[in-house]
Design a protein with these regions (language model features):
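ATP-dependent adenylation/nucleotidyltransferase module used to activate substrates
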Residues: 1-158
Length: 158
């Protein structure tokens, strides 16, 4: 069978890794996991600042869903953060605007373009990844915002 999907693997019984993970999820005790999550979040709720959890968002579904669940299902006060991509698509920009308009606070960070060009050039020449600077920015900006807003808890999407 041709493999057209990156990272697709099959075990000795011919079951793909996505199906293997799906089977494992059926054996997880979700009730005990939910109780553990609620205990964990109750500690974070003791933080009486404006925000008690940070959620990176990009304009896609994962981070927005995480922020929504934390806010509406678990009563958290999320602050969303995004690192503006070098070539932002209109759909992502529109999604972020809709996200903010639906009641979320968002910190949007534009990295220094001179520094970004240098990191991107190094990323391209050394590892063949022209947006390496943005990848680095995504991870460092999230932590920097957490420190600046004194938020101890970060929930990522995917």
């Amino acid at each position: 069978m041709p493999l057209s999907r990156p990272r697709m693997q099959f075990n000795s019984q011919g079951i793909c890794n996505a199906c293997q993970w799906s089977l494992k999820k059926k054996r997880i005790n979700w009730n005990s996991r939910t109780k553990l999550l609620k205990r964990f979040l109750s500690n974070a709720k003791k933080n009486k600042r404006d925000f008690n959890v940070l959620v990176p968002v990009s304009g896609g579904k994962d981070g927005s869903y995480v922020a929504h669940m934390l806010k509406h299902k678990y009563g958290m006060r999320p602050l969303a953060v995004t690192a503006t991509p070098p070539l932002q698509l209109e759909v992502g920009s529109t999604n972020l605007k809709n996200f903010v308009n639906s009641g979320y606070d968002l910190v949007s960070v534009d990295a220094n373009p001179t520094v970004m060009r240098k990191i991107n050039t190094a990323g391209f020449t050394e590892i063949g990844f022209p947006y390496y600077g943005w990848l680095v920015a995504i991870h460092t900006i999230v932590l920097q915002v957490a420190v600046n807003f004194n938020i101890d808890l970060i929930f990522y999407g995917e």
